């Protein structure tokens, strides 16, 4: 993975940790207004596939991140596809373990998330 691709993965992980997970946790809804639900693109294999500690799959492209989530009836979230291991900051694993116990994601959804170009936008804690 080259430096450019690694940076995209880092931006994606920060975006999901700061923006997506808190909204899912607080709102208790299955969709978020500013995120468009999409089907997996036919050329998704060209993206970079990563797995977060809470077992969600992220396809990283040059300007979009594809987050694929699947939740089984027993409440556990599983990844779809063969993941690369995503390198995250220390402590991240402990902070997001709760995700597997939140039964708010129904079946399979693909979230198309724009990658913010300015890292400063991701550093703000909400």
Swiss-Prot record:
Keyword Membrane included in the entry's annotation: yes
Membrane topology annotation: Single-pass membrane protein
Major location (coarse): membrane
Domain of life: Eukaryota
Transmembrane segments: 48-68
Keywords noted in UniProt: Membrane, Transmembrane, Transmembrane helix
Entry GO terms, CC: membrane
Compartment(s): Membrane
UniProt protein name: Putative uncharacterized protein PRO1933
């Amino acid at each position: 993975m080259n430096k450019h691709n690694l940076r995209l993965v880092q931006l994606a992980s920060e975006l999901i940790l700061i923006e997506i997970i808190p909204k899912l946790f607080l709102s208790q809804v299955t969709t978020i207004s500013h995120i468009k639900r999409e089907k997996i693109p036919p050329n998704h294999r060209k993206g970079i596939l990563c797995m977060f500690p809470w077992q969600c799959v992220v396809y990283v492209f040059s300007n979009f991140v594809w987050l694929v989530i699947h939740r089984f009836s027993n409440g556990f979230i599983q990844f779809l596809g063969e993941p690369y291991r995503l390198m995250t900051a220390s402590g991240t694993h402990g902070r997001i373990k709760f995700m597997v116990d939140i039964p708010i994601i129904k079946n399979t959804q693909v979230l198309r998330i724009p990658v913010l170009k300015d890292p400063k936008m991701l550093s703000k804690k909400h």
